[in-house]
Regions:
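Short loop segments at secondary-structure junctions
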Residues: 10-11, 34-36, 45, 109-113, ...
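Nudix hydrolase/Nudix homology domain
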Residues: 52, 97-99, 113, 121-163
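A short coil-to-beta-strand element that immediately follows conserved catalytic motifs
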Residues: 82-89
């Protein structure tokens, strides 16, 4: 939905802006650490680039679902794991100059096997990637999504601090 904002700034200047208003409650992207040295990635089809992309599990929040519960649900649907330890470590916007959408970065630890049915059209490949090889990962042609790249470095740096 396109929303119009008529604003007056502190200097008296008036402007009209248009922005894309998010339809939902936002989204989560999950940095799931099976141990202190690895992170879980999924390989899934991305229709925008008409190809497969390596990235972190992610998805939209459902109605009446808090961020941590939504992250745990997405983790189970996409990776076949749930987490006993979940916490929000940041918030990312895609284009704050014209979109209201935000993605919340969730760190997931203390993982255990648990699968929920998801909405993906095919089973996703789950890859354990070493945190000390992130530079190699983001130089690949199949790991280009900005939210994933930002969340990977946030999780790696936080994991280093907590050792």
């Amino acid at each position: 939905k396109i929303e119009q904002l008529d604003l007056e700034f502190s200097n008296g200047e008036r402007r009209t802006y248009e922005r894309l208003k998010s339809r939902g409650l936002g989204a989560v992207i999950i940095a799931a650490l099976p141990d202190d040295d690895h992170i879980l990635l999924v390989r899934e089809y991305a229709c925008g680039i008409h190809g497969y992309e390596l990235g972190l599990p992610k998805g939209r929040l459902e109605a009446d679902e808090d961020r941590l519960a939504g992250a745990n649900r997405e983790l189970q649907e996409e990776c076949g794991f749930a987490a006993r330890d979940l916490r929000e470590i940041g918030r990312l916007t895609l284009a704050p100059g014209y979109m209201t959408h935000a993605t919340h970065v969730i760190l997931a630890r203390d993982l255990y096997p648990s699968r929920l049915p998801g909405d993906e059209p095919e089973t996703l490949d789950v890859i354990r990637w070493p945190l000390d090889r992130l530079t190699e990962l983001v130089q690949r042609e199949d790991c280009t999504e900005g939210r994933t790249i930002a969340a990977l470095y946030m999780a790696r740096d936080l994991a280093k601090l907590q050792r």
